[in-house]
């Protein structure tokens, strides 16, 4: 594992935490904290990088089967998800005004991690609301083995990423802002480009690691990356959400 990723996880986890604190105190209700939602995208990108880092070679060399990969991923997601879901049910006093049938529908959607496919807040944020991100991860894991042949050709993977990202931007442009969260932000299908971006970064990393990059060159790349991120973070409020 790449040790420097641990510090990045910490930083972006804090960003996500800060973005959710606006309900606690108006101190957090500022642009600086609100932009922390980009941390969610970071974790989806990181997922694509880590999964490719750990499994792409194994699939290419037939050292792991699709079934074994999926079983391992399910074992990683579902036990803890179900535990937190049942705790939420027990302690959350979750009630739906329309009655028991709707409660059961929402519960089953959450139980099976299909709630984020339904563009209604009372579904994708029901019970344990952060579980919508697990819906996305579940789709990423399902798709990954089928993306391996494309990933071997960097240009094909880049093309798939660009086309899907452009289509999503176009779709968001014609979607009322009140519907963007349900149709585009939490939807696992429209989050797939984040995962593809992570896979792309791994292909880049895999190519560069064999080259003799000096500490100076590495520092320049690092500083440029941080500067680009900070520029986005500071001026993001000037850019419509559709294009962010």
Give the label of every model feature segment.
Residues 91-102, 174-179:
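Helix-to-loop transition at the C-terminal end of transmembrane segments
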Residues 3, 28-34, 69, 73, ...:
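Juxtamembrane loop-transmembrane helix junctions in multi-pass integral membrane proteins
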Residues 14, 18, 46, 82-90, ...:
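Generic alpha-helical transmembrane segments of integral inner-membrane proteins
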Residues 37-40, 57-93, 103-110, 135-141, ...:
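Transmembrane alpha-helical segments and their boundary/interface "anchor" motifs
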Residues 26-29, 56-60, 95-98, 119, ...:
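Juxtamembrane transmembrane-helix termini
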Residues 2-59, 75-84, 105, 109-115:
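Functionally critical transmembrane alpha-helices in membrane proteins and complexes, commonly lining
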Residues 11, 32, 64, 72, ...:
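Residue-level detector of alpha-helix boundary/anchor positions
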Residues 6, 23, 105-138, 142-244:
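Aromatic-enriched alpha-helical transmembrane segments of multi-pass intramembrane proteins
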